Curated annotation (Swiss-Prot):
GO terms for cellular component: catalytic step 2 spliceosome. The keyword Acetylation does not apply. It comes from Neurospora crassa (strain ATCC 24698 / 74-OR23-1A / CBS 708.71 / DSM 1257 / FGSC 987). It catalyses: [protein]-peptidylproline (omega=180) = [protein]-peptidylproline (omega=0). Gene3D superfamilies: Cyclophilin-like. This is Peptidyl-prolyl cis-trans isomerase-like 1.
Length: 163
């Protein structure tokens, strides 16, 4: 059964489908952090038009965040998964095997990231929200001029879908 995570932001809600078969450890980390409320009230601290939006750092600086496995954990690079277009969900890192809690969502194809970042899902619903987030004006450090915040992120349970 697929795992989906609904992410409610100050700009709207989007749903992520996690690739649990291809990156089980990464998906478990993301889903567990979401259910614990770890991502609630965090900002998308880096937005680069036509490239990606990045969030998941509780410090909001791009230098923070930990995984459920400790500070960092290893990559789960799958050769069949590529950054082929907008809506690809990947782990942000500072080099090999430095995954924590930060993630990014692509706004366009980014093939130079293939093999360097763990792809662990995609935007299933709400790509318009992601595109609007990608248009937010930023400063010279790619920080949004207007705060874009995750209000709440949670795993979608089957009973939630029936309601």
């Amino acid at each position: 059964m697929a795992t989906d995570v609904a992410v409610e932001t100050t700009m709207g809600t989007f749903t992520l489908e996690l690739y649990t078969n291809h990156a089980p450890k990464t998906c478990k980390n993301f889903a567990t952090l979401a259910d614990r409320g770890y991502y609630d009230s965090t900002v998308f601290h880096r937005i680069i038009k036509d490239f990606m939006i990045q969030g998941g750092d509780p410090t909001g600086t791009g230098r923070g965040g930990s995984s459920i496995y400790g500070e960092k954990f290893e990559d789960e690079i799958h050769p069949g998964l590529k950054h082929t277009g907008a809506g690809v969900l990947s782990m942000a890192n500072a080099g090999p095997n430095t995954n924590g809690s930060q993630f990014f969502i692509t706004l366009a194809p980014t093939p130079w990231l293939d093999g360097k970042h763990t792809i662990f899902g995609r935007v299933k619903k709400g790509m318009g929200v992601i595109r609007r987030m990608g248009m937010v004006p930023t400063d010279k450090e790619d920080r949004p001029a207007t705060e874009v915040k995750i209000v709440k992120a949670r795993v979608v349970r089957e009973e939630d879908m029936e309601a």
